[in-house]
Amino acid sequence: MSTSGTTKGIPIPLNIFKRKSIPFGRISRVTPKPEQLLHPFYRPGNVSSLGLCMKEGKPALLDSKSIIPSIVQNSKTGNPVLANCSLAFSSVQGVSTWLKQYENLRETRTTPFSTIPFPDLNRYLTSLPKSKVEIIEKAYTNLINNDGSHISKGIILELVHELSSDFELAVFSENILIFFLNDKVSKRSELACVLEAAFDLLDTHIDQPKTIYKFLMAFFAKYFEVPVQTDTDLNTLMVKLLMKLENKFHLESMYSKMVPELTEALFSFYTREGNLHEANIAINDLIKKGFIPKSEDIENYLTLINTKYPGHNSQDYMWRLFHIAHFEGLIQSSDHPNLLKFLVQNCRHREEIETVFTIVAKNKNSKILLEHLTAPVIDSISNMKMHRVPKSSLLSDYYKMMKFAFNNELSHQLKLLLLQGYITFGNFSMSAKIIEDNHLNLTVDIANKLIKIIKHNNKLFKGIDCPGFSEEALALFLECYIKPFEDELNQHSKKWLIRQQHYCK
């Protein structure tokens, strides 16, 4: 099923829970297998699937555009690389089998999710018996009286050495770490001291993964209390600690024995610290185990993705979708407006955004989602590389869905957004219909806004004879809905309207 040409590929980890780098490579353009696709939400519609199976020559989905993130093999090295691929086939043979495999695979990824029962992390901070607290406090006071310091890695390690050597006291290294977190830490630099001490103690005193896991629960309880600052790099210290944990105990993954509550805390930590790679690994582990992170952490994660990959180029689109590749099951049942907004903003083809429309229409909270998605949908359609007539058709599909969801009772703001959308796409017939059918009361401010949109897109409106999109349709719209405000328009709008009326004559 290969086609000619080449496309660049990006090296990715062989295993998302490992961190081995792979050399950069180039790959032959091939149709990826269903299991190689990493697109988190696109599904071919019934019409597209039928057309794919019936088309002679070289059938394709998404107009053969290379917009599907996929893991494929480098034809020269055999190593896996991440690349934007197209769903184009060399012939119709085998297409129906490919589609069936693709659909079956997607069905297995839409399993139900559970909400994580988030515990009170503070109980890990206060878990030490009073008798142990008194022993550690006394030893600490004696130590700082001699040293003059308050908290440092050296003091923590010295206390561990002093107290753990007395077996009758039964004070362990993790007790001392938690003591400092609960009673002594109030800023990030002190959190760093405790992490550094834990890192060293992994070599000498900590002999079970669960000891570190318990410490980390207490650490995060304090971390979420401490004011956010950028003067101390906790991220690097955390990564080094967990890598050391993984290597010491020969774990397949540092997450393999973690409870979901701890993985969620790590996910939240990495999103706050700006570590997208580790946050991606953490959330993939949660989703793989059937758990949904907190809504605010998902939103922070999406913001982080956009911060790292803000561009409108194919590479940034690919990386943004890659980082939510495992969200498929979550997306199908999600009622988080910002997650659906993220999907809309990363649609580059009409069939992608039509898939999002289907997801929203099936959602029990579709009205809430539609209220949040209307402006992003119009922006996304506007940015697609296609003629304004099919753009307007897409907006009409969305409008029909809105009318059904709201039983034709749209808010003034939604009506106005739809009107501005149709004006942007130059469909003056539908613009008039929005006004008339929805009894939209225009004002001079709205008229000025519409003129500004028309002026910005004026070159696109010329030379189109399609009904509703022509210059005659524009002239009629201006005459009926804008001219009544002529005397009240701002200076720029009034001058433009006069010139336009003169031109139309």
From Swiss-Prot:
Keywords: Mitochondrion, Transit peptide, Translation regulation. Residues 1-30 form a transit peptide. Its main location: mitochondrion. It is found in: Mitochondrion. One of its GO terms (cellular component) is mitochondrion. It holds the Pfam family AEP1. One of its GO terms (molecular function) is translation regulator activity. Belongs to the AEP1 family. Required for translation of the mitochondrial OLI1 transcript encoding subunit 9 of mitochondrial ATP synthase. This is ATPase expression protein 1, mitochondrial. It comes from Candida glabrata (strain ATCC 2001 / BCRC 20586 / JCM 3761 / NBRC 0622 / NRRL Y-65 / CBS 138) (Yeast). The gene is AEP1.
